[in-house]
Structures are given as structure tokens and as C-alpha cells.
Amino acid sequence: MFAKKMTIAGLACLLAVEASGCGNTGGGQVTSIRIGVSVYDQYDTFVSEMINHFNEYASEVSASMDTNVSVNIDVYNAAASQTTQNNQVKTMLEDGCDIICVNLVDRTEPVTIIDMAEKKDVPVIFFNRELVEQDLERWDKLYYVGAKAFESGIMQGEMAADIFKNDPAADKNGDGVFQYIVLEGEADHQDAIVRTEYAVSTITDQGVPVEKLGYAIANWNRAQANTKMSQLLTEYGDQIELVLSNNDDMALGAVDAMKAAGIDQAEWPVILGIDGTDVGLAALKNGEIRGTVYNDKEGQAEKMFDLAFCLARGLPLDDLGLEGGKYIRQPYTKLEEVPEEQE
């Protein structure tokens, strides 16, 4: 799961190309594929790592199998602007991209992109930031690759409850209640809301009483989380026993704030993240955070490429694990230590 690999689905898809020699559904043999990718923010650590692996995997596939098909990938940064992203998709379509992959800026505003792609008959793979189900049903060439946000919240909550029950030092004031703060991704963002809601409800379902001291929206960003955590430390100080962060970058922002405040690491609250980014795993290894929930960026990147390749070649999608013909979801993994393959 954590090491680079070529998925069985990808191999099956490419072997089908070799066996059949088929081109796309239009009848002409495909000799090149152009994939356009728009990310909501290139500085988002998880998204950046996922796209890096997407490119690496595409190169691995091209080098390891004689497909007689060249793959070109154009990556655009929407810089947190839906208008910019819409214009980027327009450019990709005008430039002749065969497949569009979109990491939506605003999950509630995909219609412009969908309409443009449908007019050009170019399939769209949305990824990581899940659009509303009804929008994905607007056309039969729309797909989503990602994970189920609630699963990460449940796993984060399970880790928090387990730590509280098994580490007496986690209950710093000894009152039998886990006092916590939340670092939330975005205001009114479905994934952020779901991760927080399920994390907290899971802790209480595990029989651990909690008290919410405060929360801050830090937009998935480490620097913003540093600022927000510093403010929360000023207000609540050592009352904070648990930091529930919607992603690793914000968890690391909390770490930065603790260091800036000169607080000894032994006195830090329990800090938990989500994503299992490279920097997040490094912080887990050295004990700065107590746990993270691994969001399989490698698996998602590979599945997205497999899907894009098969769509562009007009190949069957049977081996790709699509749910309802639309969704590919990779499972999360709970991590309280770094796996050996990441050492």
C-alpha cells in the first residue's frame, strides 16, 4: 500500500491493449493520450504528493510496457479560484486533451466544467475533493477517485480514545475528560465537517467523555494552523489535551506553534492528523504527532491513471473496481507508528 507498485488493475488494462490492439471507441488507433489535470492548490501537500506519484506512475507504465502509446500530462494550479479552474479546463479542452482530471476548488460548483466537457465529449475524472452525488450523475462520462471522508474521522477518533484509555499522561489535569480543540480544513467544506463530526462522535462512542474548548479554520494550511494554534494556546494554554486536525499539514502547524511557544515536547497535547503525507509520517516517527490516518495517495494516483488510460483507449473498465460505475474509493489506514517500508 505504501510502496510504489503497479496495480493489478493497471496491468490488466494495459495487457488488454496489447492483446486486442484496439484503439478508442471511435475506431481509429490511439497513438498518444493527453491528460489535463487541474489541482485546487499546488501547495496542498497531499495533493502535490498525489500528483507527483501520478506522473511517476505514468512514466513507469510507459517504460515497462510496449503500449505504442505516448502519454502527455499537463498539470495546472487553480490557486484556490474556481473561475481560474474553469478557464483552465476550457484551455485543456481547446488544446485537445483526451481526459480531464479535476481536483475541484468548490465541490458545489462543477456544472460549468461538466457542461464544457460534455459538449466536447471528453470524460472527466474528479478526484480528492468529492462533488455532490447528483452532479456526478449529470452525465455518464463523469467519475470520482478518492476515499470516504467519514472513515478517516472514525479512525482518528479511535486513535484518540485508545490513547486516552491507555496513556494516563494524556489526561493532563486528571479529570477523566478529554479536553480538545479542532483545526478544521475549510468553512462549510463537507470533508472537513465529516472528519470532525465522526472523530468526535467516535471518541464518545468509545466511552471517553470530551469537552470542546475551541476550534479554528486553517484551510488545510500549515502556516495558518500555526497562527490559529498560537491563538488557542494563548486562550487555553495547558488545558488543551487533544488536537484533532483535519489533515497533517494543520497538525504540523500545531507542532510549530508548540515549538514557538517554547513548550517542552513532554507537555504537548496529543496531536492527531489525517493523510499520512511524507512530512506527516516524519513527524509521527519522531513523536511530534501521535497518529495519522493514511490516505492512500499512491493508490488513488494509480487508479486515476488506470481509469484515464482505459477511458482514452475505449477499453472496458471492469477490472478497475468502480462502485456504481462512477466511484473508485481507496481505504484509509490508521497509523500510530510509521510502517517499515517508510523507514
Enumerate the language-model features and the residues they cover.
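Flexible loop/hinge segments that line or gate small-molecule binding clefts
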Residues: I113-E151, A170-V177, T277-K285
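Hydrophobic alpha-helical
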Residues: K90, I99-K119, V124, A199, ...
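Short beta-strand elements in bilobed, periplasmic/extracellular small-molecule ligand-binding domains
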Residues: V61-A78, Q179-V182, T204-R222
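Short, solvent-exposed amphipathic alpha-helices that sit
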Residues: F46-M65, S152-Q156, Q190-P209, Q224, ...
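Hydrophobic alpha-helical segments within soluble ligand-binding/sensing domains
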Residues: Q29, Q85, Y143-G176, A225-N226, ...
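Hinge/cleft segment of the Venus flytrap/periplasmic-binding protein
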Residues: T31, G176-A187, D191, T202, ...
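Short, low-complexity disordered leader/linker segments with a strong preference
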Residues: M1-R34, M65-D66, L93, D115-K120, ...
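Extracytoplasmic "Venus flytrap"
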Residues: R34-V61, D74-N87, C97, N103-T108, ...
